[in-house]
């Protein structure tokens, strides 16, 4: 039995969210293939780890037991991570960035000790990650705003094995912008099911 952690990095209500619809299809198939796995869900909208911003005022407590360390230990305890990640202003949501700021901590999730010059060692090397991402613009419109590359690179930096991310792009441009989340996501259902079976 494996433990799967699901992180919701979307600010959109689930019934109106393309990324939530992607996650719904993915998890439905995942549960069929892995009926005994434990699934833990984190809604960053409702947690301090999603809303607490790193500033000079919060720096001394940011990685304390109730903040960063709690979630770092959770990542070390689970086997798999599903990240729900829409794009906002060319990046992940502020909540997801806050979460990553809490868990990307030297000597906990990565280390420079014993690394070769200019390199690091990721400490989450038993973690497998699947990224489900959406963005309003078609892929490639804004190459400098690649939130999927940021997420993939960050989790790999921390040692995780990242499965091929699934990006649903162009959701704010016609014809997709005129459709419901179910209609939009139906175009990649087979990709989601295939990824869930392998995860």
UniProtKB/Swiss-Prot annotation:
Belongs to the azoreductase type 1 family. Binds 1 FMN per subunit. Coiled coil: none annotated. InterPro entries: Flavodoxin_fold (IPR003680), Flavoprotein-like_sf (IPR029039), FMN-dep_NADH:Q_OxRdtase_AzoR1 (IPR050104), NADH:quinone_OxRdtase_FMN_depd (IPR023048). Gene3D superfamilies: 3.40.50.360. One of its GO terms (molecular function) is electron transfer activity. It catalyses: 2 a quinone + NADH + H(+) = 2 a 1,4-benzosemiquinone + NAD(+); N,N-dimethyl-1,4-phenylenediamine + anthranilate + 2 NAD(+) = 2-(4-dimethylaminophenyl)diazenylbenzoate + 2 NADH + 2 H(+). It comes from the Bacteria. FMN binds at residues 10, 17-19, 87-90. Keywords: Flavoprotein, FMN, NAD, Oxidoreductase. This is FMN-dependent NADH:quinone oxidoreductase 1. Pfam families: Flavodoxin_2. Its cofactor is FMN. Homodimer. It comes from Mesoplasma florum (strain ATCC 33453 / NBRC 100688 / NCTC 11704 / L1) (Acholeplasma florum). Its EC number is 1.6.5.-, 1.7.1.17. Quinone reductase that provides resistance to thiol-specific stress caused by electrophilic quinones.
């Amino acid at each position: 039995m494996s433990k799967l952690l699901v992180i919701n990095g979307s600010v959109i209500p689930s019934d109106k969210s393309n990324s939530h619809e992607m996650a719904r299809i993915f998890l439905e198939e995942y549960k069929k293939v892995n009926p005994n796995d434990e699934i833990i869900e984190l809604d960053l909208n409702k947690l301090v780890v999603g809303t607490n911003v790193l500033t000079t005022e919060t720096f001394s407590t940011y990685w304390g037991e109730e903040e960063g360390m709690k979630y770092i230990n959770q990542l070390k305890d689970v086997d798999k991570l599903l990240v729900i990640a829409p794009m906002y202003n060319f990046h992940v949501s502020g909540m997801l960035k806050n979460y990553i700021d809490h868990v990307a901590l030297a000597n906990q999730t990565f280390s420079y000790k014993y690394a070769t010059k200019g390199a690091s060692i990721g400490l989450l090397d038993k973690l497998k990650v699947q990224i489900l991402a959406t963005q309003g613009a078609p892929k490639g419109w804004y190459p400098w705003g690649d939130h999927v590359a940021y997420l993939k690179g960050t989790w790999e930096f921390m040692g995780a094995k990242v499965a091929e991310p699934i990006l649903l792009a162009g959701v704010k441009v016609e014809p997709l912008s005129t459709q419901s989340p179910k209609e939009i996501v139906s175009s990649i259902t087979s990709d989601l099911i295939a990824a869930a079976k392998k995860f």
